[in-house]
From Swiss-Prot:
GO terms for biological process: cytoplasmic translation. This is Large ribosomal subunit protein uL6. It comes from Erwinia tasmaniensis (strain DSM 17950 / CFBP 7177 / CIP 109463 / NCPPB 4357 / Et1/99). InterPro entries: Ribosomal_uL6-like, Ribosomal_uL6-like_a/b-dom_sf, Ribosomal_uL6_a/b-dom, Ribosomal_uL6_bac-type, Ribosomal_uL6_CS. Part of the 50S ribosomal subunit.
Amino acid sequence: MSRVAKAPVVIPAGVEVKLDGQVISIKGKNGELTRTLNNAVEVKHADNTLTFAPREGFADGWAQAGTSRALLNAMVIGVTEGFTKKLQLVGVGYRAAVKGNAVSLALGFSHPVEHALPAGITAECPTQTEIVLKGADKQLIGQVAADLRAYRRPEPYKGKGVRYADEVVRTKEAKKK
């Protein structure tokens, strides 16, 4: 049995929840998020809580219920507080700038890298070597951050590249003659 699924999700004031079969919509001050739930999970909306239970006939019911509870809890946090992800650019001449709905990166290539941001994600650059991504969808924020990091991952000898703000890059020792 999933211990995660047994804990209900508390819905704070100012958040609307619509449950239509297996499709759930959560609306708050930061926008609206919609997700289709697994058929193995039964969700009940009562008072200001969402409770989860597995349906009969599904072997992975409790596991899916725990996953669904974690995803919906992230949706509630996203529409109330939002999520942020910080990236750092380490390297000589590595710079970032926000141009409209895109992030422009100078990463040592012969051309600047332009990355369009999806709807619901905003970016800002407090300095030329920092990018702060903000949005309500936790999965989408992580995917955009991973896409930006993939342009120039931190290399293991000097640590140059795009890294998460809390990432520790393990560096190797240079080859000795």
